Amino acid sequence: MNAITIFFIILSTVAVCIIIFQLYSIYLNYDNIKEFNSAHSAFEFSKSVNTLSLDRTIKDPNDDIYDPKQKWRCVKLDNDYVSVSMFGFKSNGSEIRKFKNLESCIDYTFSQSTHSDIKNPCILQNGIKSKECIFLKSMF
């Protein structure tokens, strides 16, 4: 084998490895790709999508949390959805922030609320017997 043959063998091996890495990346993100395609299928033949797309894979508040109890989630409380974790509820000042549907709760929790107030009703005086504190304890 001469040097040119070895060079082309190495080059073809690198090319095959890059293709395998790309296929694996597509495999890992297949659900996100399907979601994007279904959301933008109406714009298939347009020059640009011309809409804002929310990519929750960039920054997620749960990325750096390893304890499942501390992870943020949207759950139903009475007839509304709330953002809850072991720390408490996401709030807008003194009241728990409530959402009419699950999608708006998810959008707020995982995109808009990077630095929002958190209300824990269990640390307030007489809050241990409140409905919100009992609900929070039942979640964990």
UniProtKB/Swiss-Prot annotation:
Q: List residues in topological domain: Virion surface.
A: 22-140
Q: How is it modified after translation?
A: Contains two intramolecular disulfide bonds. They are created by the viral disulfide bond formation pathway, a poxvirus-specific pathway that operates on the cytoplasmic side of the MV membranes.
Q: Which residues cross the membrane?
A: 1-21
> Record keywords: Transmembrane helix included?
yes
Classification via InterPro entries: Poxvirus_A28 (IPR007664)
For this entry, list what GO says about its biological process.
membrane fusion involved in viral entry into host cell; symbiont entry into host cell
A cellular component term from Gene Ontology for this protein is: membrane
Where in or outside the cell it occurs: the entry states:
Virion membrane
Provide this UniProt record's keywords sorted from A to Z.
Disulfide bond, Fusion of virus membrane with host membrane, Late protein, Membrane, Signal-anchor, Transmembrane, Transmembrane helix, Viral envelope protein, Viral penetration into host cytoplasm, Virion, Virus entry into host cell
- What membrane topology does the annotation report for this chain? Single-pass type II membrane protein
Q: What is its main location?
A: virion
Family assignment from sequence similarity: Belongs to the poxviridae A28 protein family.
Q: Give the function comment from the record.
A: Envelope protein required for virus entry into host cell and for cell-cell fusion (syncytium formation).
In its UniProt entry, what is this protein called?
Envelope protein A28 homolog
| Species for this entry | Lumpy skin disease virus (LSDV)
